[in-house]
Design a protein with these regions (language model features):
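C-terminal signal-anchor/stop-transfer transmembrane helix together with its immediate cytosolic
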Residues: 399-443
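Generic alpha-helical structural element
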Residues: 74, 78, 108, 192-196, ...
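Residue-level signal for secondary-structure boundary elements
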Residues: 16, 97-100, 215, 298, ...
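Acidic, S/T/G-rich, low-cysteine, solvent-exposed domains in lumenal/extracellular/periplasmic regions
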Residues: 94, 110-386
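Juxtamembrane amphipathic/hinge helix adjacent to a transmembrane helix
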Residues: 380-408
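Alpha-helix boundary/capping detector
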Residues: 34, 46, 232-234, 400-407
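Juxtamembrane extramembrane loops of integral membrane proteins
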Residues: 1-164, 182
């Protein structure tokens, strides 16, 4: 892949300590050797007007340093290559892994396998730990035993009063935590009803310490996802033959592109919150918004129960005054410190296997924007801002090599005109004008 080859050569020019060797597996006949070190070919379908074929493509990068190595197993473009290279080289030089511990405090604790896989693919070494109240044996590891390792918590359905006290102490004493949870849970496998147990309430009160106050509402937005529903009744409840309907569901929010989510991302039954920094300052903390809804967002208050039925949930606010922008993710930073100690993401379902699968085109095309934000959050907690800036860097121009055979003649003519004909014409024009002025001056 020419883009990748050119980028690697440019990357090596920046330092005398970096060298690049390009190897063509078909010419070197080393496909078997590559397979032994974890590099395999990927079948790529190519087609033209006359034929179609499948080619086994090798496009991997192996980085060697003092007898150790790291591998990027497959790369076809340079959209994030600088980030991947820098991360791998940094890991080799510093001789350390990037550990992160994960606690599943959700009611569906086994529903986050995709998040685990994504974290590992991004170079993190995942350690599954438990809440202190759930430690059953000496084999189990409680999250507070690994105070130097950043912590991810999914859900809040299992918190005890003791867990909340230990977590608060963990954060205030220097621990780094990314929490993804609403102050309630959704019965996603059945009727989508909203439940709030004592554990959710304890978690909600814990957030008061950081100046975060959950609204007793569900958050809706005009910018939302369209879902597919099957129904055997009409809008009045009368029976009719089974049919499929596509419904805009305001409780599944599509966050628009913003500073901390350049491609936007999806939220499922999120609970917005207010921030009170006068309360946070008691512990010498400051909380700031990271993600927010659109300005056409509104809240559904709890009556007897929250309305979550896609056919019954209001599609808009009752009045214009109810529309506003609401915080759905925030970070809390200690006084005189640059890096946050806590990131609260007000939705545990955006990282779950069920909703990631539902919101994706196929198992090979998962909507990973929320998982990407999760990884970014760990970089923020670790103070790796420079690495994060490389990850979100998007100003690559590779259009020179993105020309089809059918358009190559026209592209060549345009290139020749721009680089040869146009400069000659400009120089001749300048010379002619200068000649006329000189001639008039001599007269």
């Amino acid at each position: 892949v020419k883009d990748v080859t050119d980028f690697l050569q440019s990357y090596a020019v920046e330092s005398k300590q970096v060298s690049v060797e390009i190897i063509n597996p078909s010419k070197e006949n080393i496909a078997k050797k590559l397979s032994e070190i974890g590099i395999r070919g990927y079948p790529i379908r190519t087609s033209s007007a006359d034929s179609a074929s499948i080619t086994n493509v090798y496009s991997a990068i192996k980085i060697d340093y003092l007898g150790k190595s790291e591998t990027i197993p497959f790369v076809l473009n340079i959209s994030r290559l600088e980030f991947d290279l820098t991360r791998k080289i940094k890991s080799l030089i510093e001789e350390k892994e990037n550990p992160v511990q994960v606690v599943c405090a959700s009611s569906f604790a086994n529903g986050y396998s995709l998040a685990f896989q994504y974290l590992e693919a991004e170079g993190f070494s995942v350690i599954q730990t438990s809440l202190p109240s759930e430690k059953n044996s000496s084999v189990d590891i409680s999250f507070d035993e690994l105070s130097d390792i950043p912590l991810i918590i999914f859900g809040s359905d299992k918190f005890t009063k003791t867990d909340c006290k230990i977590l608060e102490k963990f954060i205030l004493n220097g621990g780094k935590v990314f929490i993804a949870s609403q102050p309630y849970s959704i019965d996603f496998e059945d009727n989508w009803s909203v439940k709030q147990n004592e554990s959710n309430q304890l978690f909600e009160r814990l957030m008061f310490t950081f100046g975060i106050y959950f609204k007793q509402t569900l958050t809706c937005d005009i910018s939302n996802l369209r879902i597919t529903m099957t129904s055997n009744s009409d809008v009045n409840g009368n029976k009719k033959s089974a049919h499929t309907e596509y419904i805009n569901y305001p409780l599944w929010i599509s966050l628009r592109a913003q500073e901390n989510a350049l491609s936007g991302l999806s939220l499922f039954w999120p609970c917005a919150f207010d921030i009170d920094n006068e309360v946070a300052e008691i512990e010498r903390l400051k909380t700031t918004t990271l993600l927010f809804t659109s300005n056409r967002s509104w809240q559904i208050p709890r009556t007897e129960n929250f309305i979550t039925n896609p056919f019954a949930v209001p599609k808009s606010a009752e009045s214009e005054e109810e529309y506003s922008t609401f915080a759905v993710c925030a970070s809390t930073t200690k006084e005189n410190e640059k890096d946050p100690s806590l990131i609260l993401f007000a939705d545990q379902y955006a990282f779950s296997d069920s909703l990631l699968s539902y919101n994706s085109n196929s198992i090979f095309d998962v909507d990973s924007r929320s998982l990407d934000f999760l990884c970014n959050g760990i970089f923020m907690l670790n103070g790796e801002d420079e690495l994060l800036s490389l990850k979100t860097k998007t100003t690559f121009n590779t259009t020179l090599y993105k020309i089809s055979n059918e358009n190559i003649r026209n592209a060549a003519i345009k290139t020749l005109f721009t680089t040869c004909v146009l400069p000659i014409f400009i120089n001749l024009t300048i010379g002619f004008v200068f000649f006329l002025k000189r001639r008039r001056f001599n007269k």
